[in-house]
UniProtKB/Swiss-Prot annotation:
SUPFAM superfamilies: Creatinase/aminopeptidase, Creatinase/prolidase N-terminal domain. This is Xaa-Pro dipeptidase. Transmembrane segments: none annotated. Keywords: Dipeptidase, Hydrolase, Manganese, Metal-binding, Metalloprotease, Protease. Dipeptidase that catalyzes the hydrolysis of dipeptides with a prolyl (Xaa-Pro) or hydroxyprolyl residue in the C-terminal position. Pfam families: AMP_N, Peptidase_M24. CDD domains: Prolidase. A dipeptide binds at H278, D310, H400, R417. Belongs to the peptidase M24B family. Eukaryotic-type prolidase subfamily. Mn(2+) 1 binds at D299, D310, E471.
Length: 501
Protein backbone atom coordinates (compact mmCIF):
# COMPACT_ATOMS: atom_id res chain seq x y z
CA UNK A 1 0.00 0.00 0.00
CA UNK A 2 1.43 3.35 -1.01
CA UNK A 3 1.88 5.89 1.75
CA UNK A 4 1.87 9.67 1.62
CA UNK A 5 5.46 11.00 1.89
CA UNK A 6 4.66 12.56 5.26
CA UNK A 7 3.82 9.09 6.57
CA UNK A 8 7.25 7.63 5.82
CA UNK A 9 8.93 6.27 8.91
CA UNK A 10 5.72 6.18 10.93
CA UNK A 11 4.22 3.00 12.29
CA UNK A 12 1.96 1.64 9.56
CA UNK A 13 -1.70 1.06 10.25
CA UNK A 14 -3.14 -2.37 9.68
CA UNK A 15 -4.22 -2.51 6.03
CA UNK A 16 -7.17 -4.75 6.84
CA UNK A 17 -8.55 -2.10 9.18
CA UNK A 18 -8.64 0.37 6.33
CA UNK A 19 -10.79 -1.87 4.20
CA UNK A 20 -13.55 -1.16 6.71
CA UNK A 21 -12.87 2.14 8.46
CA UNK A 22 -10.94 5.38 8.31
CA UNK A 23 -9.71 4.61 11.82
CA UNK A 24 -7.20 2.21 13.30
CA UNK A 25 -5.90 2.40 16.86
CA UNK A 26 -4.52 5.90 17.34
CA UNK A 27 -4.81 7.03 13.71
CA UNK A 28 -7.13 8.62 11.19
CA UNK A 29 -6.16 7.55 7.68
CA UNK A 30 -7.95 6.98 4.38
CA UNK A 31 -5.17 4.85 2.93
CA UNK A 32 -3.34 5.18 -0.38
CA UNK A 33 -1.54 8.54 -0.57
CA UNK A 34 -3.59 10.33 2.07
CA UNK A 35 -2.17 11.71 5.28
CA UNK A 36 -2.06 9.42 8.29
CA UNK A 37 -3.05 11.63 11.22
CA UNK A 38 -1.86 10.49 14.67
CA UNK A 39 -4.75 11.03 17.07
CA UNK A 40 -2.28 11.72 19.84
CA UNK A 41 -2.66 15.21 18.34
CA UNK A 42 -5.86 15.56 20.36
CA UNK A 43 -4.37 14.04 23.50
CA UNK A 44 -1.66 16.70 23.28
CA UNK A 45 -4.37 19.33 22.80
CA UNK A 46 -6.03 18.20 26.03
CA UNK A 47 -2.72 18.34 27.85
CA UNK A 48 -2.00 21.82 26.49
CA UNK A 49 -5.39 23.07 27.61
CA UNK A 50 -5.14 21.64 31.11
CA UNK A 51 -1.57 22.88 31.57
CA UNK A 52 -2.59 26.38 30.49
CA UNK A 53 -5.55 26.49 32.87
CA UNK A 54 -3.59 25.12 35.82
CA UNK A 55 -0.69 27.51 35.25
CA UNK A 56 -2.92 30.59 34.97
CA UNK A 57 -5.71 29.73 37.41
CA UNK A 58 -4.08 27.41 39.94
CA UNK A 59 -5.56 29.24 42.93
CA UNK A 60 -9.05 29.19 41.45
CA UNK A 61 -9.26 25.58 40.26
CA UNK A 62 -10.21 23.24 43.08
CA UNK A 63 -9.32 19.59 43.39
CA UNK A 64 -11.64 17.23 41.49
CA UNK A 65 -12.55 19.82 38.87
CA UNK A 66 -13.49 18.78 35.35
CA UNK A 67 -14.02 20.24 31.89
CA UNK A 68 -17.27 19.13 30.26
CA UNK A 69 -17.84 19.48 26.51
CA UNK A 70 -20.78 18.42 24.37
CA UNK A 71 -20.42 17.23 20.79
CA UNK A 72 -22.62 18.28 17.93
CA UNK A 73 -26.06 16.74 17.75
CA UNK A 74 -27.47 14.56 15.01
CA UNK A 75 -30.31 16.35 13.24
CA UNK A 76 -32.83 15.83 10.48
CA UNK A 77 -33.40 18.18 7.57
CA UNK A 78 -36.41 20.29 8.53
CA UNK A 79 -39.40 17.95 9.01
CA UNK A 80 -38.00 15.08 6.93
CA UNK A 81 -36.24 11.87 7.92
CA UNK A 82 -33.16 12.85 5.91
CA UNK A 83 -30.05 13.14 8.07
CA UNK A 84 -27.53 15.64 6.63
CA UNK A 85 -23.87 14.63 6.68
CA UNK A 86 -22.73 15.29 10.24
CA UNK A 87 -19.90 17.72 10.96
CA UNK A 88 -18.55 17.76 14.48
CA UNK A 89 -18.64 20.77 16.77
CA UNK A 90 -15.14 22.16 16.53
CA UNK A 91 -14.20 22.66 20.20
CA UNK A 92 -15.21 19.06 20.86
CA UNK A 93 -13.26 17.83 17.86
CA UNK A 94 -10.17 19.81 18.86
CA UNK A 95 -10.26 18.16 22.27
CA UNK A 96 -11.18 14.57 21.39
CA UNK A 97 -10.75 14.07 17.62
CA UNK A 98 -14.07 12.22 17.54
CA UNK A 99 -16.61 12.70 14.76
CA UNK A 100 -19.41 10.89 16.62
CA UNK A 101 -22.57 12.91 17.29
CA UNK A 102 -24.54 13.08 20.55
CA UNK A 103 -21.51 12.63 22.82
CA UNK A 104 -20.07 14.33 25.87
CA UNK A 105 -16.42 14.59 26.81
CA UNK A 106 -14.84 14.98 30.22
CA UNK A 107 -11.29 16.16 30.89
CA UNK A 108 -9.91 16.18 34.42
CA UNK A 109 -8.10 19.31 35.53
CA UNK A 110 -5.24 17.22 36.84
CA UNK A 111 -1.66 16.67 35.72
CA UNK A 112 -2.68 13.64 33.65
CA UNK A 113 -5.51 15.48 31.87
CA UNK A 114 -7.62 12.37 32.44
CA UNK A 115 -10.05 11.96 29.54
CA UNK A 116 -13.44 10.28 29.33
CA UNK A 117 -15.44 10.03 26.11
CA UNK A 118 -19.17 9.50 26.72
CA UNK A 119 -20.89 7.93 23.72
CA UNK A 120 -24.60 7.36 23.05
CA UNK A 121 -26.02 3.91 23.70
CA UNK A 122 -27.37 2.96 20.29
CA UNK A 123 -30.47 0.82 19.64
CA UNK A 124 -30.03 -2.57 17.98
CA UNK A 125 -31.67 -1.40 14.73
CA UNK A 126 -28.81 1.07 14.25
CA UNK A 127 -26.73 -1.86 13.00
CA UNK A 128 -29.29 -2.57 10.28
CA UNK A 129 -29.38 0.92 8.85
CA UNK A 130 -26.08 2.55 9.79
CA UNK A 131 -23.53 -0.20 10.36
CA UNK A 132 -21.78 -2.04 13.16
CA UNK A 133 -22.27 -0.82 16.71
CA UNK A 134 -18.75 -0.42 18.09
CA UNK A 135 -17.73 -1.29 21.63
CA UNK A 136 -16.40 1.04 24.31
CA UNK A 137 -13.03 -0.66 23.99
CA UNK A 138 -12.94 0.10 20.28
CA UNK A 139 -13.42 3.84 20.83
CA UNK A 140 -10.94 3.87 23.70
CA UNK A 141 -8.22 2.44 21.45
CA UNK A 142 -9.08 4.70 18.52
CA UNK A 143 -9.30 8.06 20.28
CA UNK A 144 -6.62 7.44 22.93
CA UNK A 145 -8.82 8.39 25.87
CA UNK A 146 -8.51 6.96 29.36
CA UNK A 147 -12.07 5.68 29.54
CA UNK A 148 -15.23 5.39 27.48
CA UNK A 149 -18.67 5.51 29.09
CA UNK A 150 -22.20 5.70 27.82
CA UNK A 151 -23.79 9.11 28.12
CA UNK A 152 -26.27 7.82 30.69
CA UNK A 153 -23.31 6.84 32.91
CA UNK A 154 -21.78 10.34 32.88
CA UNK A 155 -23.53 11.80 35.92
CA UNK A 156 -22.71 8.79 38.07
CA UNK A 157 -19.06 9.09 37.06
CA UNK A 158 -18.90 12.75 38.08
CA UNK A 159 -20.63 11.98 41.37
CA UNK A 160 -18.20 9.14 42.06
CA UNK A 161 -15.32 11.59 41.62
CA UNK A 162 -16.91 14.14 43.99
CA UNK A 163 -16.68 16.73 41.24
CA UNK A 164 -16.20 20.13 42.86
CA UNK A 165 -16.57 22.32 39.74
CA UNK A 166 -17.61 21.60 36.17
CA UNK A 167 -16.12 24.01 33.62
CA UNK A 168 -18.17 24.60 30.47
CA UNK A 169 -17.86 26.86 27.43
CA UNK A 170 -19.98 29.99 27.16
CA UNK A 171 -18.86 32.74 24.80
CA UNK A 172 -19.55 34.63 21.61
CA UNK A 173 -17.98 33.90 18.24
CA UNK A 174 -16.74 37.29 17.03
CA UNK A 175 -17.11 36.32 13.36
CA UNK A 176 -20.73 35.19 13.51
CA UNK A 177 -21.92 37.01 16.61
CA UNK A 178 -23.50 33.73 17.75
CA UNK A 179 -23.29 32.54 21.34
CA UNK A 180 -21.85 29.11 22.03
CA UNK A 181 -24.45 26.91 23.74
CA UNK A 182 -23.29 25.25 26.96
CA UNK A 183 -23.62 21.48 27.46
CA UNK A 184 -27.21 20.56 28.21
CA UNK A 185 -27.90 17.55 30.42
CA UNK A 186 -30.74 16.99 32.90
CA UNK A 187 -29.73 17.73 36.48
CA UNK A 188 -26.21 18.94 35.67
CA UNK A 189 -26.57 22.42 37.15
CA UNK A 190 -28.75 21.22 40.01
CA UNK A 191 -26.13 18.64 41.04
CA UNK A 192 -22.79 20.37 40.44
CA UNK A 193 -21.21 23.79 40.67
CA UNK A 194 -20.89 24.90 37.03
CA UNK A 195 -18.42 27.62 35.96
CA UNK A 196 -19.03 28.95 32.44
CA UNK A 197 -16.62 31.90 32.37
CA UNK A 198 -13.11 30.47 32.70
CA UNK A 199 -12.94 27.87 29.92
CA UNK A 200 -13.95 29.77 26.78
CA UNK A 201 -11.00 32.20 26.47
CA UNK A 202 -8.51 29.48 27.43
CA UNK A 203 -9.61 26.82 24.95
CA UNK A 204 -10.06 29.41 22.19
CA UNK A 205 -6.53 30.70 22.77
CA UNK A 206 -5.18 27.15 22.61
CA UNK A 207 -6.83 26.80 19.21
CA UNK A 208 -5.16 30.01 18.00
CA UNK A 209 -1.64 28.60 18.46
CA UNK A 210 -1.34 25.46 16.39
CA UNK A 211 0.74 22.49 17.49
CA UNK A 212 3.24 21.00 15.01
CA UNK A 213 0.85 18.09 14.40
CA UNK A 214 -2.01 20.47 13.66
CA UNK A 215 0.21 22.39 11.24
CA UNK A 216 0.95 19.17 9.36
CA UNK A 217 -2.76 18.49 8.85
CA UNK A 218 -3.36 22.07 7.69
CA UNK A 219 -0.35 21.79 5.40
CA UNK A 220 -1.90 18.68 3.86
CA UNK A 221 -5.19 20.52 3.29
CA UNK A 222 -3.26 23.34 1.64
CA UNK A 223 -1.29 20.93 -0.55
CA UNK A 224 -4.53 19.29 -1.67
CA UNK A 225 -6.08 22.67 -2.41
CA UNK A 226 -3.03 23.93 -4.31
CA UNK A 227 -3.05 20.79 -6.44
CA UNK A 228 -6.77 21.19 -7.15
CA UNK A 229 -6.53 24.91 -7.94
CA UNK A 230 -3.76 24.19 -10.46
CA UNK A 231 -5.87 21.40 -11.94
CA UNK A 232 -8.81 23.80 -12.35
CA UNK A 233 -6.63 26.52 -13.90
CA UNK A 234 -5.60 24.08 -16.60
CA UNK A 235 -9.24 23.11 -17.24
CA UNK A 236 -10.67 26.64 -17.47
CA UNK A 237 -11.73 27.89 -20.88
CA UNK A 238 -14.18 30.37 -22.30
CA UNK A 239 -17.70 28.91 -22.43
CA UNK A 240 -17.40 26.71 -19.35
CA UNK A 241 -19.89 27.11 -16.54
CA UNK A 242 -18.60 28.26 -13.17
CA UNK A 243 -20.09 25.14 -11.57
CA UNK A 244 -18.01 22.94 -13.87
CA UNK A 245 -14.90 24.51 -12.37
CA UNK A 246 -16.28 23.90 -8.89
CA UNK A 247 -16.94 20.25 -9.74
CA UNK A 248 -13.37 19.80 -10.99
CA UNK A 249 -12.04 21.09 -7.67
CA UNK A 250 -14.37 18.93 -5.57
CA UNK A 251 -13.57 15.78 -7.52
CA UNK A 252 -9.83 16.39 -7.42
CA UNK A 253 -9.53 16.93 -3.67
CA UNK A 254 -11.71 13.89 -2.93
CA UNK A 255 -10.41 11.48 -5.56
CA UNK A 256 -6.72 12.36 -5.26
CA UNK A 257 -6.45 13.50 -1.63
CA UNK A 258 -9.32 11.90 0.30
CA UNK A 259 -10.96 15.22 1.19
CA UNK A 260 -14.68 14.48 1.25
CA UNK A 261 -15.57 17.96 2.45
CA UNK A 262 -14.49 21.49 1.73
CA UNK A 263 -14.18 24.06 4.48
CA UNK A 264 -16.81 26.39 3.00
CA UNK A 265 -19.02 26.82 -0.05
CA UNK A 266 -16.87 27.05 -3.17
CA UNK A 267 -16.66 30.51 -4.74
CA UNK A 268 -16.18 30.10 -8.50
CA UNK A 269 -16.80 33.63 -9.70
CA UNK A 270 -16.18 34.71 -13.28
CA UNK A 271 -16.77 37.96 -15.16
CA UNK A 272 -18.43 40.63 -12.99
CA UNK A 273 -19.30 37.98 -10.40
CA UNK A 274 -15.70 38.19 -9.19
CA UNK A 275 -16.71 41.43 -7.45
CA UNK A 276 -19.16 39.50 -5.21
CA UNK A 277 -17.14 38.67 -2.11
CA UNK A 278 -19.06 35.55 -1.05
CA UNK A 279 -20.45 34.43 -4.40
CA UNK A 280 -21.49 30.79 -4.82
CA UNK A 281 -24.32 30.68 -2.26
CA UNK A 282 -27.78 29.28 -3.05
CA UNK A 283 -28.93 32.56 -4.56
CA UNK A 284 -25.84 32.89 -6.79
CA UNK A 285 -24.85 29.24 -7.28
CA UNK A 286 -21.77 29.40 -9.53
CA UNK A 287 -24.05 29.22 -12.56
CA UNK A 288 -22.70 31.82 -15.00
CA UNK A 289 -20.86 31.10 -18.24
CA UNK A 290 -17.23 32.21 -18.43
CA UNK A 291 -17.01 34.94 -21.08
CA UNK A 292 -14.29 35.81 -23.60
CA UNK A 293 -12.86 38.59 -21.45
CA UNK A 294 -13.85 36.97 -18.18
CA UNK A 295 -11.66 37.19 -15.14
CA UNK A 296 -11.92 34.27 -12.70
CA UNK A 297 -11.76 34.52 -8.92
CA UNK A 298 -11.83 31.03 -7.43
CA UNK A 299 -11.88 30.75 -3.63
CA UNK A 300 -11.88 27.10 -2.50
CA UNK A 301 -10.29 25.08 0.27
CA UNK A 302 -10.14 21.35 1.00
CA UNK A 303 -10.92 19.88 4.41
CA UNK A 304 -9.25 16.82 5.95
CA UNK A 305 -9.69 15.51 9.48
CA UNK A 306 -11.89 18.59 10.01
CA UNK A 307 -9.04 21.06 9.41
CA UNK A 308 -9.26 23.24 6.33
CA UNK A 309 -7.40 25.34 3.81
CA UNK A 310 -8.67 28.64 2.37
CA UNK A 311 -7.07 29.71 -0.90
CA UNK A 312 -8.05 32.14 -3.65
CA UNK A 313 -6.62 32.25 -7.16
CA UNK A 314 -7.43 35.03 -9.65
CA UNK A 315 -6.61 34.77 -13.34
CA UNK A 316 -7.97 35.56 -16.83
CA UNK A 317 -10.04 32.80 -18.42
CA UNK A 318 -7.98 33.01 -21.60
CA UNK A 319 -4.70 32.67 -19.73
CA UNK A 320 -3.58 36.07 -21.00
CA UNK A 321 -3.93 39.28 -18.98
CA UNK A 322 -5.39 42.37 -20.62
CA UNK A 323 -3.63 45.67 -19.80
CA UNK A 324 -6.34 46.60 -17.28
CA UNK A 325 -6.36 43.15 -15.67
CA UNK A 326 -2.58 43.35 -15.41
CA UNK A 327 -2.76 46.67 -13.49
CA UNK A 328 -5.28 45.46 -10.93
CA UNK A 329 -3.70 42.04 -10.45
CA UNK A 330 -0.23 43.50 -9.97
CA UNK A 331 -1.60 45.94 -7.39
CA UNK A 332 -2.98 43.07 -5.33
CA UNK A 333 0.13 40.95 -5.82
CA UNK A 334 2.35 43.82 -4.63
CA UNK A 335 0.19 44.09 -1.51
CA UNK A 336 0.43 40.34 -0.92
CA UNK A 337 4.22 40.31 -1.26
CA UNK A 338 4.65 43.37 0.98
CA UNK A 339 2.55 41.79 3.73
CA UNK A 340 4.42 38.49 3.67
CA UNK A 341 7.77 40.25 3.75
CA UNK A 342 6.65 42.16 6.86
CA UNK A 343 4.93 39.33 8.74
CA UNK A 344 6.70 38.06 11.87
CA UNK A 345 5.99 37.72 15.59
CA UNK A 346 5.29 41.06 17.23
CA UNK A 347 3.75 42.67 14.15
CA UNK A 348 0.24 44.13 14.42
CA UNK A 349 -2.32 42.65 12.03
CA UNK A 350 -3.96 46.08 11.82
CA UNK A 351 -0.67 47.43 10.49
CA UNK A 352 -0.56 44.62 7.93
CA UNK A 353 -4.06 45.53 6.72
CA UNK A 354 -3.04 49.18 6.42
CA UNK A 355 0.09 48.18 4.50
CA UNK A 356 -1.97 46.18 1.98
CA UNK A 357 -4.44 49.04 1.59
CA UNK A 358 -1.62 51.54 0.94
CA UNK A 359 -0.11 49.30 -1.73
CA UNK A 360 -3.42 48.97 -3.56
CA UNK A 361 -4.25 52.68 -3.37
CA UNK A 362 -0.77 53.62 -4.58
CA UNK A 363 -1.19 51.37 -7.61
CA UNK A 364 -4.62 52.84 -8.41
CA UNK A 365 -3.11 56.32 -8.18
CA UNK A 366 -0.31 55.35 -10.52
CA UNK A 367 -2.82 53.91 -13.01
CA UNK A 368 -4.81 57.15 -12.97
CA UNK A 369 -7.98 55.55 -11.60
CA UNK A 370 -7.61 57.71 -8.50
CA UNK A 371 -6.24 61.24 -8.18
CA UNK A 372 -4.94 63.25 -5.26
CA UNK A 373 -2.63 62.56 -2.33
CA UNK A 374 -2.25 59.05 -0.92
CA UNK A 375 -2.70 60.21 2.68
CA UNK A 376 -5.89 62.06 1.72
CA UNK A 377 -7.23 58.89 0.11
CA UNK A 378 -6.52 56.94 3.29
CA UNK A 379 -8.06 59.63 5.51
CA UNK A 380 -11.24 59.63 3.41
CA UNK A 381 -11.49 55.80 3.53
CA UNK A 382 -11.19 55.37 -0.24
CA UNK A 383 -9.36 52.12 0.45
CA UNK A 384 -12.55 50.49 1.74
CA UNK A 385 -14.30 51.24 -1.57
CA UNK A 386 -11.90 48.91 -3.40
CA UNK A 387 -10.81 46.69 -0.47
CA UNK A 388 -13.93 46.36 1.72
CA UNK A 389 -12.94 43.29 3.74
CA UNK A 390 -10.19 42.58 6.23
CA UNK A 391 -6.78 41.35 5.18
CA UNK A 392 -7.27 37.88 6.63
CA UNK A 393 -8.40 35.62 9.43
CA UNK A 394 -7.17 32.77 11.57
CA UNK A 395 -7.43 29.34 9.95
CA UNK A 396 -7.76 25.89 11.46
CA UNK A 397 -10.77 23.75 12.27
CA UNK A 398 -12.96 26.64 11.19
CA UNK A 399 -12.38 28.61 8.01
CA UNK A 400 -12.74 31.77 10.07
CA UNK A 401 -11.05 30.25 13.09
CA UNK A 402 -11.61 31.38 16.65
CA UNK A 403 -9.67 33.83 18.80
CA UNK A 404 -9.55 36.91 16.60
CA UNK A 405 -10.58 39.20 19.42
CA UNK A 406 -8.97 37.52 22.42
CA UNK A 407 -5.61 38.08 24.05
CA UNK A 408 -3.84 41.32 23.13
CA UNK A 409 -6.36 42.44 20.52
CA UNK A 410 -6.94 46.11 19.85
CA UNK A 411 -10.51 47.45 19.77
CA UNK A 412 -12.56 45.92 16.97
CA UNK A 413 -11.94 47.49 13.58
CA UNK A 414 -14.71 47.40 10.99
CA UNK A 415 -14.32 44.44 8.60
CA UNK A 416 -11.16 43.09 10.30
CA UNK A 417 -11.60 39.60 11.75
CA UNK A 418 -8.68 40.13 14.11
CA UNK A 419 -6.61 43.04 15.43
CA UNK A 420 -4.07 40.92 17.27
CA UNK A 421 -0.30 40.96 17.33
CA UNK A 422 1.17 38.01 15.46
CA UNK A 423 2.69 35.10 17.40
CA UNK A 424 4.61 32.05 16.27
CA UNK A 425 2.24 29.14 15.71
CA UNK A 426 -0.64 31.21 14.37
CA UNK A 427 -2.01 30.19 10.98
CA UNK A 428 -3.66 33.11 9.24
CA UNK A 429 -4.79 33.94 5.72
CA UNK A 430 -3.41 36.88 3.78
CA UNK A 431 -5.99 37.88 1.19
CA UNK A 432 -5.67 41.41 -0.16
CA UNK A 433 -8.17 42.25 -2.86
CA UNK A 434 -9.26 44.99 -5.23
CA UNK A 435 -12.84 45.01 -6.46
CA UNK A 436 -15.06 47.21 -8.59
CA UNK A 437 -18.31 46.85 -6.66
CA UNK A 438 -21.02 48.96 -8.22
CA UNK A 439 -22.92 49.99 -5.12
CA UNK A 440 -19.74 50.99 -3.25
CA UNK A 441 -18.54 53.01 -6.22
CA UNK A 442 -21.96 54.65 -6.55
CA UNK A 443 -21.90 55.66 -2.88
CA UNK A 444 -18.41 57.12 -3.19
CA UNK A 445 -19.22 58.97 -6.42
CA UNK A 446 -22.43 60.45 -5.01
CA UNK A 447 -20.54 62.10 -2.14
CA UNK A 448 -18.62 65.23 -3.23
CA UNK A 449 -16.07 64.67 -0.45
CA UNK A 450 -15.01 61.35 -1.96
CA UNK A 451 -16.03 61.76 -5.63
CA UNK A 452 -13.18 64.23 -6.19
CA UNK A 453 -10.62 61.41 -5.85
CA UNK A 454 -11.94 59.44 -8.86
CA UNK A 455 -11.00 59.77 -12.52
CA UNK A 456 -14.22 58.55 -14.13
CA UNK A 457 -12.72 58.13 -17.59
CA UNK A 458 -10.08 55.73 -16.31
CA UNK A 459 -12.40 54.05 -13.79
CA UNK A 460 -14.83 53.03 -16.53
CA UNK A 461 -12.08 51.04 -18.26
CA UNK A 462 -11.75 48.78 -15.20
CA UNK A 463 -15.28 48.26 -13.90
CA UNK A 464 -15.94 45.16 -15.99
CA UNK A 465 -13.01 43.31 -14.45
CA UNK A 466 -15.04 42.54 -11.34
CA UNK A 467 -12.44 41.81 -8.71
CA UNK A 468 -9.07 40.30 -7.86
CA UNK A 469 -8.17 38.51 -4.65
CA UNK A 470 -4.95 36.64 -3.85
CA UNK A 471 -5.32 34.48 -0.76
CA UNK A 472 -2.57 32.44 0.82
CA UNK A 473 -2.41 30.42 4.02
CA UNK A 474 0.45 31.58 6.23
CA UNK A 475 2.14 30.00 9.25
CA UNK A 476 3.78 32.55 11.54
CA UNK A 477 7.22 31.21 12.51
CA UNK A 478 9.74 32.31 15.14
CA UNK A 479 11.63 34.40 12.58
CA UNK A 480 9.01 35.37 10.00
CA UNK A 481 6.39 33.39 8.14
CA UNK A 482 5.97 30.33 5.93
CA UNK A 483 3.59 30.64 2.99
CA UNK A 484 2.03 27.17 2.97
CA UNK A 485 0.48 27.78 -0.47
CA UNK A 486 3.67 29.05 -2.10
CA UNK A 487 3.57 26.40 -4.84
CA UNK A 488 0.81 28.20 -6.70
CA UNK A 489 1.65 30.29 -9.77
CA UNK A 490 1.23 33.85 -8.51
CA UNK A 491 3.09 36.32 -10.70
CA UNK A 492 1.56 37.36 -14.02
CA UNK A 493 4.35 35.64 -15.94
CA UNK A 494 3.93 32.44 -13.89
CA UNK A 495 0.17 32.34 -14.45
CA UNK A 496 0.38 32.97 -18.19
CA UNK A 497 3.11 30.36 -18.63
CA UNK A 498 1.24 27.80 -16.51
CA UNK A 499 -2.10 28.22 -18.28
CA UNK A 500 -0.63 28.13 -21.77
CA UNK A 501 1.11 24.79 -21.26
Amino acid sequence: MSVHPRNQGKDDCCEKTHLDSQYSPGYYWLGNNTLKVPLVLHKENRQRLVSQILSKHKDQVKENSFILLESGKSTMQYDTDHEPLFKQERYFFWTFGSDIPDCFGIVGLDEQATSILCIPKLPAEYATWMGEIRSKEYYKSIFLVDQVLYVDEMMDYLKSKNASTIYTILGTNTDSGSTFVEPQYPGLRETFNVNNTLLFPEIAECRVIKSPKEVEVIRYCVDASVSAHKHVMRKVKVGLKEYQCESEFLHHVYNEWGCRNVGYTCICAANKNSAVLHYGHAGEPNSATISENGFCLFDMGAEYHSYTADITCSFPATGKFSPEQRVVYQAVLDASVAVMEAMRPGVSWVDMHKLAERCILAALLKAGILVGDLQDLIANKIGSVFFPHGLGHFLGLDTHDVGGYLGDCQPKVHSLRTTRTLKAGMVITSEPGCYFINHLLTQALSNPETAKFFNLTELDKYRNIGGVRIEDDILVTETGCDNLSKNLPRTIDEIEAFMLK
